[in-house]
Regions:
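Short beta-strand segments
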Residues: 51, 72, 132-136, 198-204, ...
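A short amphipathic alpha-helix within small helical-bundle interaction modules
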Residues: 4-7, 18-21, 25-32, 37-40
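ATP-binding/phosphotransfer module of carbohydrate and carboxylate kinases, centering on a glycine-rich
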Residues: 63-130, 140-143, 161-171, 183-193, ...
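A short acidic Gly-Thr/Ser loop motif
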Residues: 10, 71-76, 200-204, 222
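Short hydrophobic alpha-helix segments
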Residues: 93-95, 150, 219
Length: 388
């Protein structure tokens, strides 16, 4: 116990315990506190005084930190993370969305997940400056209302207001792909550039746009619907009602449909059946990667076609925006190898105007699932500056 390193370790333990036990004025160290700790624990007075001082230092340091909670809300899971000012993730929490429940119960689950992240960080709720959330579907970031989230079957849900009522913490909302793009821009693949477009390929396809260092929302807050660029006029019907959208050609749902059709209607043999336990209704990105690695001809052909149309989509974005960087992310991109990215690049160059791709970097996302929570925390801090 005479080792100062040991004293520091004990101080870390006691920093929270002391305040919980009633040492409210812990930052004003006195002999009274040391004597009380001695009486409570039986340790020597000198050691008690050192522990109190170490706890004081730790509490003061924690008080000076400015924490926010970033949340990535999806149709299947909710991720929450307590994040320090420098972007360091201090704690994480995860729970199932249970989207079949009514909005009030799902919002309760979001609030519980946030509280769990705060508790895991060893912080009190009043240490959290704000909560930032990335949510699916068209939404109004100013009022914090989800206009329509098809995966949740939500219409006009005032998520910001409902969470602030439950948490008593300022809460800010933006589109999930926007916050993922911001995360990559500030702490991931996009660091050091001034303009970029994030294209995220998963169940659907979404995009986020950074221009002159700022997130671009558009006039009615719907900028970035890259999944609905038309890349094949006579292509399959998209959920939006149009035909030949990028999402209808290259999303995971589109990939699944094409593989299923090849196997069931054309009688093609594929390892996918074995790898996915015979299920052709939903094929996960990891399974696609395994099939490609195994040399599965059906999957490889479909993924080559997928890359082609993603390349055409990238070319369209570069033609009209010409950003410094295109960041490709999402489950489908993250699961596949560099050959997939190179094929996207090949078709982007082929379909872009001459020289338009010069100097435009096509990069892959670096942050994975953390992009959403980090981006949400960044936007929350920005809103704090402009709102309060």
């Amino acid at each position: 116990m005479k080792d100062l390193t040991a004293i520091k370790g004990v101080g870390e333990f006691f920093a929270k315990k002391l305040s919980q036990a009633g040492y409210q004025s812990i930052t004003n160290v006195t002999d009274v506190h040391a004597k009380r700790l001695q009486a409570d624990t039986g340790i020597p007075l000198l050691i008690a005084a050192r522990i109190i001082k170490e706890a004081q230092s730790l509490i003061a340091e924690a008080d000076s930190e400015k924490y926010v909670v970033g949340v990535d809300m999806g149709g299947t899971k909710i991720l929450a993370a307590t994040i320090a000012e420098d972007g360091t993730i201090v704690s994480r929490a995860k729970t199932a969305t249970k989207a079949h429940k009514d909005p009030a119960k799902v919002i309760d689950r979001i609030a519980d997940c946030i509280n769990t992240a705060i508790e895991k960080a060893g912080l009190e709720k009043n240490s959290i400056q704000a909560v930032g959330i990335g949510a699916p579907g068209p939404l109004d970031p100013q009022d914090g209302v989800i206009i329509f989230a098809p995966n949740l079957n939500w219409y006009n849900v005032p998520l910001k207001k409902e969470l602030e009522n439950r948490l008593n913490i300022p809460t800010f909302l933006d589109n999930d792909v926007n916050v993922g793009t911001v995360g990559e821009f500030t702490h991931g693949a996009g660091q050091g550039v001034n303009s970029l477009v994030g294209i995220f390929v998963g169940t659907g396809i979404g995009g986020g746009i950074i221009l002159n260092g700022k997130l671009f929302h558009g006039t009615n807050k719907t900028a970035g619907e890259i999944g609905h660029i038309i890349v094949k006029a006579d292509g399959p019907k998209c959920n939006c009602g149009n035909s030949g959208c990028l999402e209808a050609m290259s999303s995971r749902i589109a990939i699944t449909k094409r593989i299923r059709r090849a196997i069931l209607k054309r009688g093609k043999k594929s390892h996918i059946l074995e790898l996915n336990d015979g299920n052709l209704d939903s094929i996960r990105s990891g399974t696609l990667a395994k099939a490609v690695a195994a040399g599965d001809k059906v999957t490889i052909k479909v993924m080559r076609r997928t890359a082609k149309y993603l390349g055409i989509g990238v070319a369209s974005v570069v033609n009209f925006l010409n950003p410094e960087m295109i960041i490709l992310g999402g489950g489908v991109v993250e699961a596949l190898d560099d050959k997939f990215i190179e094929r996207i690049r090949k078709f982007a160059v082929a379909y872009a105007l001459p020289n338009t791709m010069d100097g435009v970097e096509i990069a892959t996302a670096k942050l994975g699932d953390d992009a959403g929570v980090i981006g949400a925390s960044v936007l929350a801090r920005q809103h704090l500056v402009t709102t309060y």
